[in-house]
């Protein structure tokens, strides 16, 4: 009888030690208060962004800013490709606000739209989608998110002019990503059709940046995904007329 009791106690102790070990491991891997608290701001399925300190920092800053006194801003909305550019300097327009966040997705943009539309901006230029594909989302899912983004803007800020910029190509030879040229071109086709249906301005940047193999031209990038200075100058030349109008 004592032997059975001893075995039972031993097994229970081992079980508790295993559970404790797993909890310690989880805490070391980032299961902390910041991650839990962030769920009130960011959709939990944003795997790339929830664990990204840069994302959390920029997101919290945007939510902390008071409404600027200057109305009718021009907003650039997107991921790191948008964030990396000093748009107000590039386009010589101090009325431009950069709301790009590294690692963001179309779902992430949907979650933070309230922080955008409350500004009642004059124009919004949107580009996103590459990070969605990295999360395994389909072209259909990304298109659907775009549609919801545009309709949300129109519902909450009806005077805002929306500009959808085509998704730029990437260069798999440099970045080794699994995203294919076909995913990008299929998304761009969907966005162009949607823009025509909804009366949204569609800016087709893709042909200017793509090479003969369907990849981002090497002269416009260092890592195969993000643009360098020459790339942003080319982008500027394609959109500056929409800024002036």
Language-model-detected regions and their locations in the chain:
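Hydrophobic positions in alpha-helices of CheY-like receiver
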Residues: 149-153
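General small-molecule cofactor/ligand-binding pocket signal
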Residues: 97, 163, 201-203
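Feature marks short, surface-exposed loop/turn motifs that line or immediately flank catalytic pockets
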Residues: 105, 132-134, 168-171, 209
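Conserved SGNH/GDSL esterase-like catalytic core that processes O-acyl groups on lipids
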Residues: 41-148, 176, 182
């Amino acid at each position: 009888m004592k032997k059975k009791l001893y075995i039972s106690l031993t097994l229970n102790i081992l079980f508790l030690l295993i559970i404790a070990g797993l909890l310690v491991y989880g805490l070391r891997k980032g299961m902390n208060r910041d991650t839990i608290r962030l769920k009130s701001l960011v959709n939990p399925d944003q795997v790339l962004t929830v664990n990204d300190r840069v994302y959390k920092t920029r997101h919290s800053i945007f939510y902390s800013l008071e409404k600027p006194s200057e109305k009718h801003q021009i907003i650039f909305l997107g991921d790191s490709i948008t964030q990396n550019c000093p748009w107000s300097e590039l386009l010589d327009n101090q009325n431009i606000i950069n709301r790009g966040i590294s690692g963001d997705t179309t779902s992430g943009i949907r979650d933070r739209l309230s922080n955008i539309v409350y500004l009642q901006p004059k124009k919004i230029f949107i580009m996103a989608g590459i990070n969605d594909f990295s999360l395994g989302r389909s072209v259909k899912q990304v298109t659907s998110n775009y549609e919801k983004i545009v309709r949300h803007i129109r519902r909450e800020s009806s005077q805002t002019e929306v500009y959808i910029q085509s998704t730029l190509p990437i260069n798999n030879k440099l970045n080794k990503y699994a995203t294919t040229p076909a995913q990008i071109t299929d998304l761009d086709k969907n966005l162009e059709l949607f823009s025509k249906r909804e009366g949204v301005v569609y800016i087709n940047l893709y042909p200017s940046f793509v090479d003969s193999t369907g990849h981002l031209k090497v002269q416009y990038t260092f890592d195969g995904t993000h643009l360098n200075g020459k790339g942003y100058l080319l982008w500027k030349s394609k959109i500056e007329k929409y800024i002036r109008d």
